[in-house]
Amino acid sequence: MSLFTPLSETNVRSHTNTSSVFCRRIKTLVAGLTALGLMLAAVSASAGFYVSGKQLREGNGNNFIMRGVNLPHAWFPDRTNQALADISATGANSVRVVLSNGRLWSRTPESQVASIISQAKARQLITVLEVHDTTGYGEQTAATLSEAVDYWIAIRNALIGQEDYVIINIGNEPFGNGQSASTWLNLHRDAINRLRNAGFTHTLMVDAANWGQDWENIMRNNASSLFNSDPRRNVIFSVHMYEVYPNDTAVNNYMSAFNSMNLPLVVGEFAANHFGSYVDAGSIMARAQQYGFGYLGWSWSGNSSNLSALDVVTNFNAGSLTTWGNLLINNTNGIRNTSRKATIFGGSGSSSSSAGSCGTAPNGYPYCCNASSATGNGWGWENNRSCVVATTSTSCNWYGTSYPICVNTSSGWGWENNRSCIAASTCAAQ
């Protein structure tokens, strides 16, 4: 018996047709997988804000350091659109917006939230949204964190898809004094899990205990545990610095702890005065710049008469800066001198003395901050990537903060390319 069966013409045609169909199916499958891969690549290239170590990053991987102002929308909704334009004009890259879930004030409807986000985007501002009704829960009548989550889920259509532009601050100062660490931790953990299960992939911001000031260090001591409990590891921590932080020692002790833990911190509220007590706002801004942490000054305007010193401008008039507003915006470490617009708006991205950014060369690579041309051909290696060694100095390390060298100013300080710069001679003389 023959070991091989000869192929008839019919068998050959059948085999050929089967092979042809098989090949077409393979090609279709490959094309489908390729298209899926391209879609996934597009999504991953711009998947919203995320946390890497102590840094908040845009979807494209650029660091984003908040420099902005709080805006009391829930109490003055008719002022919001103009205020957003005025806040953006200060150079701010972000705005924290007061909303209400209806527990204490008029509920902010989903349509208003969508409009706020749209207006902020038009002004190149990243929006931090917060429910203010949770303020001081446990020590005064207030909404619970669970009620705040109910609100976020109810307005989810305004939020889903805005992950590149919106950060959700779950609840403002959601615990007063006298609350246990386990209460702060467990209720925040529950809130985060509910939001994740509801489809929210946004960066979530959580406020400290003790009316946000964390004088018992409840948030500081439990931040790592809460961060690791989030399945997305996409949480940033917000402390409100008022009279508990009257000097640089208090400010630095708190910020350096988060820096050592490699966890992201934002000063979600602060001012230079609180109910007549001094707050070391200068140190808050300087230390935030040193460590690469964000800050958001309280608040644009509209504070009650006993807190009018906390207004950045008088009566929502952008041309009338208060003493506090001038400090927040024009200080060496203030908004105008340190803010960088988000790159999703075409900005250059954020930098600080710790972020290691000294500008971008024409070829798209960063300029080296410290490397020499030891590797040859004008290239260096910093922050685990190649950098361009400038042929002439382009930046100055001014007492721990990096500033660009002015092109047209021969001495002192100048203003070029919409930011402060320092003359080479002044830098050399420090």
UniProtKB/Swiss-Prot annotation:
GO biological process entries: glucan catabolic process
Catalytic activity: Random hydrolysis of (1->4)-beta-D-mannosidic linkages in mannans, galactomannans and glucomannans
E.C. designation(s): 3.2.1.78
InterPro entries according to UniProt: CBM10, CBM10/Dockerin_dom, CBM10_sf, Glyco_hydro_5, Glyco_hydro_5_CS, Glycoside_hydrolase_SF
GO molecular function, one term: mannan endo-1,4-beta-mannosidase activity
Keywords, sorted A to Z: Glycosidase, Hydrolase, Repeat
Classification via Pfam families: CBM_10 (PF02013), Cellulase (PF00150)
Domain of life: Bacteria
Active site per UniProt: E173, E269
SMART domains recorded: CBM_10 (SM01064)
Domain CBM10 per the UniProt entry, residue ranges: 357-390, 395-424
Protein purpose: Catalyzes the endo hydrolysis of beta-1,4-linked mannan, galactomannan and glucomannan. It is able to hydrolyze mannosidic linkages that are flanked by mannose or glucose.
Family note: Belongs to the glycosyl hydrolase 5 (cellulase A) family.
Protein name per its UniProtKB record: Mannan endo-1,4-beta-mannosidase
